[in-house]
Swiss-Prot record:
GO cellular component: peroxisomal matrix
Signal peptide (from-to): none
Alphabetic keyword roster: FAD, Flavoprotein, Oxidoreductase, Peroxisome
Enzyme class, first EC level, given as a word: oxidoreductase
EC numbers on record: 1.4.3.3
Function according to Swiss-Prot or TrEMBL: Catalyzes the oxidative deamination of D-amino acids with broad substrate specificity. Enables the organism to utilize D-amino acids as a source of nutrients. Enables the organism to utilize D-alanine, D-cysteine, D-histidine, D-leucine, D-methionine, D-phenylalanine, D-proline, D-serine, D-threonine, D-aspartate and D-valine as a nitrogen source and may also contribute to utlization of D-tryptophan, D-tyrosine and D-asparagine as a nitrogen source. Protects the organism from the toxicity of D-amino acids, including from D-alanine. May play a role in its interaction with the host.
Subcellular location, principal: other
Species annotation: Cryptococcus deuterogattii (strain R265)
Binding residues for anthranilate 2: 56, 262
Sequence positions that bind FAD: 10, 13, 33-34, 45-46, 50, 52, 311, 361-362, 364, 366
Name recorded for this polypeptide: D-amino-acid oxidase 2
Cofactor: FAD
């Protein structure tokens, strides 16, 4: 069998793109170091996500469009797989006054039942905050959704090869796949070190969460201001307080993800227990119900696990574009090629292309279906152009 394209990476972006390409009738194969069944691997971020649809993209940007496309497709997933995707109440709360443009999100007319909130004697907001807004949106079970996508892709006959690429050139002629003219680079953090890409703008956005058990808790609460700032000896604020969020998971387990942390260029995969305590305190302040009907403090919250994930972020903006290039003997020099494996760097010199789709940071799940749609548009356009040229 010959393939139209190879997708590098089996996180939520790579899997979503592979499925979309298959939907369009293209023959696709996948190659990745970490696979969906590696749900305890810290080598990729997807299994560790809190996973809700709460866009923090700036309105009118490509990222906002990806989020909107994804949102429009989640209703079907929630209907077919309520154990993977569920529509629940959301709220975002804060204390400091904001202008209307700051306090109203671009997606207020997209989500369900949006309304502005203000604390009154008769209406107290989460954490005793003064302002907020509420709506209904979707939460997903990240590790199970990744496994679901992977199982669906395998059921369609799409091969997924476990292989660690050193250079992008290798992907154009892999054993068991053969020659292709197009590769989709959804390698996430791997784009920083993959020879032939080596994107210096890519960085790790370390996240840490606490998975807890709180049966019956079904509300997603976001608090971007945080409660506790780091102070110096005189009591002055050194850094602003980290945000806090509460994201229930679909399914019967009663699991809830508590966060949050976003630490740029921190590559540690070890949980920081001091940070975990801060997360538990913050989330208890927002929702004491997490501690159960008899709970009296954050210490009564039932902890399941401490988790760390490295978000594949990128300076400026995510990268979604096509790059035309060459592979084969003499095609590339420098940029690490002197130490690259010879496989993929030798042989017939030919023109190829790569569609880059990485650097989405914290927004992987909520942007995945939109990003897959736009990446697939680029793939189709390129392959159509090659077929047209071949006929001339």
């Amino acid at each position: 069998m010959s393939f139209d394209a190879v997708v590098i990476g089996s996180g939520v972006i790579g899997l979503s793109i592979a499925r979309e390409l298959d939907n369009r009738g293209l023959k696709v194969a996948m190659v990745a170091r970490d696979l969906a069944e590696d749900s305890l691997s810290v080598g990729f971020a997807s299994p560790w996500a809190g996973c809700n649809w709460y866009s923090f993209a700036e309105g009118g940007t490509p990222a906002a469009e990806w989020d909107a496309i994804t949102f429009s497709k989640l209703a079907k997933l929630a209907e077919d797989h309520p154990d993977l995707c569920e529509k629940i109440p959301f709220c975002s709360v804060w204390d400091l006054p904001k202008s209307d443009s700051e306090s109203e999100p671009w997606f207020k007319d997209l989500v369900f039942e949006y309304k502005k909130l203000k604390s009154t004697p008769g209406q107290h907001l989460a954490g005793g905050k003064k302002f907020g807004y509420s709506f209904k949106s979707y939460v997903l079970h990240a590790p199970n959704y990744i496994r679901h996508l992977s199982s669906e892709i395998r059921a369609r006959g799409i091969p997924i090869h476990r292989y660690r690429l050193s250079s992008i050139d290798e992907a154009y002629n892999l054993p068991g796949i053969g020659k292709v003219s197009l590769v989709v680079n959804a390698s996430g953090l791997g784009a920083k070190s993959l020879i032939g890409v080596e994107d210096e703008k890519v960085y790790s956005g370390r996240g840490q969460t606490v998975l807890v058990r709180a049966p019956g808790f079904k509300a997603c609460i976001m608090h971007t201001e945080g409660f506790y700032a780091d102070l110096d000896e005189s009591g002055r604020e050194i850094t602003p307080p980290p945000p806090a969020y509460i994201i229930p998971r679909p399914g019967p387990e009663g699991h809830v993800v508590l966060g949050g942390v976003y630490q740029k260029d921190n590559w540690s995969t070890l949980p920081d227990l001091k940070e975990a305590e801060r997360i538990l305190k913050d989330c208890y302040n927002l929702a004491p119900e997490l501690a159960g009907p008899n709970g009296k403090s954050w210490k009564d919250i039932e902890i399941i696990s401490h988790n760390v994930g490295l978000r594949p972020a990128r300076e400026g903006e995510p990268r979604l574009e096509i790059e035309e290039r060459e592979v084969g003997t003499g095609a590339n020099g420098g940029n690490g090629y002197e130490v690259a494996p010879k496989f993929g760097c030798e042989g017939e010199r030919r023109k190829v292309a790569v569609v880059h789709a990485y650097g989405i940071g914290s927004a992987g799940f909520q942007a995945s279906l939109g990003m897959a749609e736009k990446a697939s548009d680029l793939v189709e356009k390129y392959l159509s152009g090659r077929r047209t040229s071949a006929k001339l």
